[in-house]
Amino acid sequence: MCLNKCALPDYLSEAGVVAVIIKPAKGVMFMLILGCLIVLAALFLLVKRYEARMVLVCAGIVMCLASGAPMKALDAFAKGMGSGMISSACSSMGFALAMRFTGCDKHLINALAKLLLKVNWLLIPGVIFGTYAVNVALPSAAGTAAAAGAIFIPILMGAGVHPAMAAAAVKCGTYGSMLNPGLAHNPFVAKIAGVNVMDVIAFHYKANIASLIVGAVVLTAIAYFLKENKGHVVEGLELDTEFKVNPLYALMPIVPIAILILGATKMVPVFKMGVAQAMVIGAILTCIVTRTNPAALTKSFFDGMGKAYGDIIGIILAAGVFVAGMNAMGLVKAFIAAMTNNPSIVKICASVGPFLLGLITGSGDAATFAFNEAVTPHAADFGMSIVQMGSMATLGGTLGRTMSPIAGATIIVAGIAGISPMEVTRRNAIPMVFAMIIGMMFLAF
């Protein structure tokens, strides 16, 4: 009988192979089947929108207990709490909350809105690109949907665009955070690959922009085909045309990004620094420019950091426990062995898997973090680089979430437009599928 060593779980030693030969791998097969059932149960609960962190942690602990190695789950949890990406994710969200507190995000959005109103025929693609730009600076899909949607959706509806199409245009641009160094997935992949976070963004930015252009073109074409680009009058809609944009306030949200880009490209060598340092500098400059109470701004910054630890780092910790459970059951080794024997499916798994999970759960984070921690470190075995595979998984999960009817950002824009979230998904489905295909072509070849 041929045994694939890669399929053996951690609890089997080299000598354990003898036992497997004597008892034709019944124990191994039982553990693999049990592990698969637990994973499927976890996926079912995620689809049913149970608390993602609870589901992942519980599933990981159960798998570790079943394998006879309960401490592996706790060790993974403890290890994750000291993760190097905490500073990037937390400082980024702290800065985003500081921008909301000072109102600088509104100045940036209104500045973009005034430009869009001057070119009426570019309203829909312009809103998509504008929302994307806002999301680059403020890396929260739901936060961007709320901030940008409150301005852009009324502008589009006031110009005669169908409410559902207006909401879909904003939602289509809510994955600009892929280009933000503070997005947790970027430093996560960078850490695995042993490279700088800006190196990861430099690798996938062309794919992101290409996917955005394709998505914007397809959605605009759908709007023209359905005749939803004009002629839909909404009574009682009033735009805040009196809002006065302060150019300095509007520039504040992009200060950290500008510092990081100028430093990483060595255009201004003194600006070469980490994400956390850039975010703190941005917050300090914002405090000076807006003359905000320093104590109040500091509180909002740290409130954002705490929210990031609970929401973003929490999912990373939970995904680590889940992966520890899969490792203990032998699922990861079996999966890697299967892909090693069929390398042609790896690129499909890396993108389509997180995309589908993002679509059906409303969040691509859990699936993407789990995939990147379990499989991406072995990218070289499949003829891919770690950054390449990690970027494919991240973009796939992000686009799936952008298309999902149960994502927080979808629900927010639908509420602003006064329509059903499914109406947003119906219009965004085809653009996001095309965006994924083009994006993956850029990353895979």
Residue ranges and their predicted role:
Residues 15, 22-39, 56, 62-67, ...:
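Long, contiguous bundles of hydrophobic transmembrane helices that form the permeation core
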Residues 29-33, 81-86, 112-129, 158-166, ...:
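Membrane-interfacial loop-to-helix junctions in multi-pass transporters
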Residues 32-36, 54-57, 121-129, 143, ...:
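Hydrophobic alpha-helical transmembrane segments
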Residues 54, 73-106, 276-280, 284-331, ...:
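Core transmembrane alpha-helical segments of multi-pass membrane transporters/permeases
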